[in-house]
């Protein structure tokens, strides 16, 4: 099921700073939607920040599971937008996932589609990893959120907790990360929580929010098996 994570939304925007796990969250949710069926699933990689982990690095995996992957190759440093976004957003038969860069630059790119990203059909998810440096205080996060959401001309959003230290994340890391999340946002609950799929069965009795199992798809070869605990 996907409704516990996105409700009735068909257009989902993913925003978050580098290291938040934004792309992994978007990729795993896209794969889940493809398994559920009922709608064609379109994934638009709009992250122009050239981070180490990008959705386009797992294009083959997405396509293999029936997700149509879209991105526009950059020419030098010129910002580009993949074609077909407006059509997909309007199409009732399509679920659309927009993976947007964490900076205002990437957010400006989707600002042109802001009129199509309104109402209950759209869900804006702001991914927070409380272990990342710029998640050190609520003020830091709110400054980033205001900057990014303002540039994208988006209003309401939901927080997603993604407490992780990379491939070596443990169950204790997740619960400690959720404690930190609670300190950052004492009056709010995350819409859902992300955790490595092998940890979810143990966490199910300790986490009250829906758990989205994460299978790492964008870990580069040099990091696999390295024992490093970072994204």
Label each PLM-derived region with a short phrase.
Residues 72-75, 94-109:
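Switch II (G3) loop of P-loop NTPases
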Residues 25, 29:
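Hydrophobic positions on the alpha1 helix immediately C-terminal to the Walker A/P-loop
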Residues 104-208, 220-221:
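Conserved catalytic-core segment of NTP-binding enzymes
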Residues 18:
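The conserved Walker
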Residues 14:
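Hydrophobic anchor at the beta1->P-loop junction of P-loop NTPases
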Residues 22:
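Conserved lysine of the Walker
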Residues 31-80:
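N-terminal phosphate/diphosphate-binding loop that engages ATP/GTP or pyrophosphate donors
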Residues 2-9:
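Phosphate-binding P-loop
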């Amino acid at each position: 099921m996907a409704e516990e994570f996105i409700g009735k939304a068909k257009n989902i925007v993913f925003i978050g700073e580098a290291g938040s796990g934004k792309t992994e969250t978007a990729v795993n949710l896209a794969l889940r939607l493809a398994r559920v069926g009922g709608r064609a699933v379109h994934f638009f990689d709009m992250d122009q920040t050239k981070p180490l982990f990008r959705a386009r690095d797992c294009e083959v995996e997405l396509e293999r599971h029936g997700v149509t992957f879209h991105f526009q190759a950059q020419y030098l440093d010129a910002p580009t937008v993949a074609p077909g976004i407006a059509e997909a957003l309007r199409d009732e038969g399509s679920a659309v996932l927009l993976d947007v860069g964490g900076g205002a630059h990437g957010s400006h790119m989707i600002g042109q589609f802001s009129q199509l990203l309104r109402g209950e059909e759209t869900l804006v998810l702001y991914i927070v990893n409380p272990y990342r440096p710029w998640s050190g205080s609520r003020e830091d996060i709110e400054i980033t959120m205001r900057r990014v959401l303002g540039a994208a001309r988006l209003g309401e959003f939901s927080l997603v907790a993604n407490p992780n230290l990379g491939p070596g994340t443990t169950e204790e890391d997740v619960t400690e990360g959720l404690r930190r999340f609670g300190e950052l946002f004492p009056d709010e609950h995350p819409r859902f929580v992300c955790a490595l799929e092998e940890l979810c069965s143990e966490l199910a009795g300790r986490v009250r929010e829906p758990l989205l199992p994460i299978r790492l798809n964008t870990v580069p070869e040099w990091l696999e098996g390295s024992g490093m605990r970072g994204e």
